[in-house]
Amino acid sequence: MATIYKVLIPLPSVDFDPSETSIPWKILKENGYEVFFATPNGKPGSADFRMLTGKGLGIWKPILIAHKKARTAYNEMISDPNFQNPISYKNLKAENFAGLILPGGHAPGMKEYLESEELQKFVGSFFATGKPVGAICHGVVLAARSKLPGTDRSILYGKKTTALLKSQEMAAWNLTRLWLGNYYRTYPQSVEEEVRSALKDPNDFHFGPKPIFRDNHKKLKWGHAITDGNYVSSRWPGDAHSFTVSFMKLLSNR
């Protein structure tokens, strides 16, 4: 009987990015993986409504909203029994999963996930097992804040990584700040700046090709994913397909 690998996707209660969660979920499910979710309180989470509806994005809605296929995948995902019955952070055990995906999101509700000491401790212990870990966009901030057990060093120290680029973050903020304020600025420090500060060498941060087009299953080269050992990272929703394919390669090599 073939082994069914279990992959965990932790989430905040609200405001996670729908594309960076639902696209990996859908691709993993289609390839025979079982996907579980975790939230702070064990109750189902909900994605950033602006990314789903485009409300408040003004004239930039067509380029900033989650793409239609991602929104469709999200609606499928939230009907999944595992999504409706998430595990609470406090009950997570690394031995129960073969892989871990850390999605992103930029709205204020993400801070609950990014700043959770309980979740950071779990991520650190999971990384130490050598099992596959994937982080995309702000999910790389969670990885950067997580420490290897018994050390004061980030799990990313000595690793090559990418994350949301400062140029991307500032562009989205500048397009919308007149009416949305700091919606696109989760923290005063950019994702790129915080992640680079956690690395052994700031040059271990990889920018990749200019992020113009969103990738898809036929255009994986439009995306960007960096793999270093058991760890794979990507920058934004436009990398989600290539990110997940790279993550699955790590799972299949175990």
Describe each region flagged by the PLM.
Residues 132-133:
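Glycine- and acidic-residue-rich phosphate-binding/metal-coordinating active-site segment common to enzymes
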Residues 137:
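Catalytic, metal-anchored helix/loop core of enzyme active sites in primary metabolism
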Residues 1-129, 142-254:
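Extended, subdomain-level signal for the structured scaffold at the beginning of enzyme domains
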